[in-house]
From Swiss-Prot:
Organism: Acidovorax sp. (strain JS42)
Protein location: Cytoplasm
Keyword Protein biosynthesis: yes
Xref: SUPFAM superfamilies: Nucleic acid-binding proteins
Protein's name according to its UniProt entry: Translation initiation factor IF-1 2
Binding partners and assembly: Component of the 30S ribosomal translation pre-initiation complex which assembles on the 30S ribosome in the order IF-2 and IF-3, IF-1 and N-formylmethionyl-tRNA(fMet); mRNA recruitment can occur at any time during PIC assembly.
InterPro entries per record: NA-bd_OB-fold, RNA-binding_domain_S1_IF1, TIF_IF1
Length: 88
């Protein structure tokens, strides 16, 4: 049985709820309840109200989602990405 395709969206956290859940408003205005993914929970990534996040949603239930990445303001791509001419 194949795994269904997940919908990836971006939004901002509007409210921190109990039990590691968050109310997220997507860029298109839709609101949903989201929880942190496994590695984010394992490494204690803190998410606060106002943070920009990427999340995955199932096409079968668009009211719930899983936060997969927290975007930091003012941070560009990391040092290992992009084209650089260093280390020759």
């Amino acid at each position: 049985m194949a795994k269904e395709e997940l919908i990836e969206m971006q939004g901002s956290v509007t409210e921190v709820l109990p039990d590691s859940r968050f109310r997220v408003t997507l860029d298109n205005g839709h609101q949903l309840i989201a929880y942190t993914g496994g590695k984010m929970r394992k490494h204690h990534i803190r998410i606060l109200a106002g943070d920009k996040v990427s999340l995955e949603m199932s096409p079968y239930d668009l009211t719930k989602g899983r936060i997969t990445f927290r975007h930091l303001a003012g941070r560009g791509p990391g040092p290992g990405t992009g084209s650089s001419s260093g280390n020759r």
